[in-house]
Amino acid sequence: MPYFESGRGRLHYRRWPVAEAGAVVALLPGSGQHSGHYHRFAKGLGEAGVELWALDTAGQGLSEGEGERPGTLRELCGDAAGFVAEVREGARVPVVLMGHSLGAATALGALDSGLVGVPAGLVVCGTPQTILRGEPPKSARGAGAGAGWTGAAPRLPEGLPVLVVHGVDDRRTPIDPVREWARTAGAEFREYADAGHDLLHEPVQAEVTADIAGWIGRMISNR
């Protein structure tokens, strides 16, 4: 099983190999989730020629750490940098960074800080509105201390293709601030009626997966 050493211990990740993949998604799950929750998503992406790698956040799945304390956002961004480095070394094809919920906040923070370089594209799902105000989400334990945020929305690399997917009925992260942020950031925005926070585990999951895979395919073909 693949692991890498982070500053906080050994972190596990999972890979679903795809022969002659055109792109790879490096997924940062949400709070309380791990790579084992994403077999169905991996299958859907794989059918479209996109390979999935997913991280077990510290304290989740097979990764070391405390399950109730995933870390500050700064620590999570450091973990993401190590994971993306592993993906880049093993993939040899364009890498799309993706995050769900806390993972979306981590992806945005890591891009803002330059820790993960510039991926081929970015997909965020269930994005916490707090991160769009420059505040770490509450699910990042202890995030208020030494998080390094300036109170401004995270900056995206110029020209980075971005897809934002969000459920209309998301009660954890209301859609309106995310829709407005996507508009001002020049991101492509997809919303899903009768869907909540965890789009990849709801009845709309097949549609969401197809939309993500299709967007990646078009983005890669236009490179």
Outline where the language-model segments fall:
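Conserved alpha/beta-hydrolase
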Residues: 37, 42-65
